[in-house]
Amino acid sequence: MLKKIIVICLIAALALTLVGCGATKAKKEKFVVTDNMEVVEKQVEDLNGDGKTQKVILYGEKDDQGMPVWTLVEEEYEIVSLDSMEGAYTLADINLQDVDGQKGLEVLFYRYNTGSAGGQGLNIYKLDRGEWQEIFNVPNSFDMGKERFTMQYMGNYQVSFKDSETGLEHVIKLDPSRYAGNEEMLDGISTWVDPIAEYKLEDIDSDGVSEITTMQMVIGIAHADPIASLQTTYRVKDGSYQPEKISLVDISGMVLVEKAL
């Protein structure tokens, strides 16, 4: 009888040990700074809104092809590492800002293209119960929009525009006076939509939460000839930013067509 009791106790102890092991979380590995890295930017702020400050550092280095890679670190732990998208981005910086209206600050991680289109990338990260979550990330395209959009000159100073992703379409009317002496170039208008070059963060409805609007220029006969802008608005839903609407806006700021997403 005593032997049976001892065996039962040993089995119970082993079971508790195994359960304990299964519930243990793996420890985070500390970020290792190498000789190839340099500090691009460092900020010290109260991220949680609890009166205690944290250090956020953006490191930069070059990969095997000589392209920049940036790593975002909070204290001694990596948040994320982003590359240059095959050379599309050459510069980067960070900004700490409360965008979702909750207690604390989010990290806005910007990357920049230094070409004439001025493309930008933006990823936003939020510290939630000790873990970093990405709450905003919109892919940016540097192919002049040819995979997604279709543009064609229709004659009579009109350009058809269609977005295959959202179904948004419109006929853009041009101002004839802008093309005096260059009318022959109008037939050359084809698909040309710049990458996202601006992110407008604004609390549109005054609820304490910032909406984000991305801005892309729609190009006519040359890059110096924008004929409209494509603006997509994102709103926080279920903890992250989701697209709400897309608008085609003329160069005077008037909305030509809008579609809910």
Residue ranges and their predicted role:
Residues 38-47, 91-99, 198-204:
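Beta-propeller blade termini
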Residues 7, 22-46, 68-70, 77-80, ...:
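N-terminal, intrinsically disordered, polar/charged segments of Gram-positive cell-envelope systems
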